[in-house]
């Protein structure tokens, strides 16, 4: 039973790994707010990196006066 669980976890990790590896990471300054909301970061990242295409943004993280963007180029 343990082997099946480990095998299943290993397969899941292998299937999700390419999605994380292909995403590019970039920091975007956000001067309007100390800790911007996620929706504000998504919009700022989309405008700065993908010409407004929000579907290419995979994840964002809010930091002190900046947004960390993960996107598919």
From Swiss-Prot:
Residues 1-23 form the signal peptide. The keyword Disulfide bond applies. It is found in: Secreted. Contains 2 disulfide bonds. It comes from the Eukaryota. The keyword Secreted applies. Keywords: Disulfide bond, Secreted, Signal, Toxin. Expressed by the venom gland. GO terms for cellular component: extracellular region. One of its GO terms (molecular function) is toxin activity. Belongs to the scoloptoxin-15 family. This is U-scoloptoxin(15)-Sm3a. The lineage of its organism: Eukaryota, Metazoa, Ecdysozoa, Arthropoda, Myriapoda.
């Amino acid at each position: 039973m343990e082997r099946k669980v480990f095998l299943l976890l290993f397969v899941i990790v292998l299937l999700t790994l390419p999605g994380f590896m292909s995403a590019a990471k970039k920091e975007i300054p956000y001067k309007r707010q100390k800790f911007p909301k996620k929706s504000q970061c998504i919009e700022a990242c989309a405008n700065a990196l993908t010409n407004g295409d929000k579907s290419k943004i995979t994840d964002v993280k809010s930091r002190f006066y900046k947004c960390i963007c993960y996107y598919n180029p």
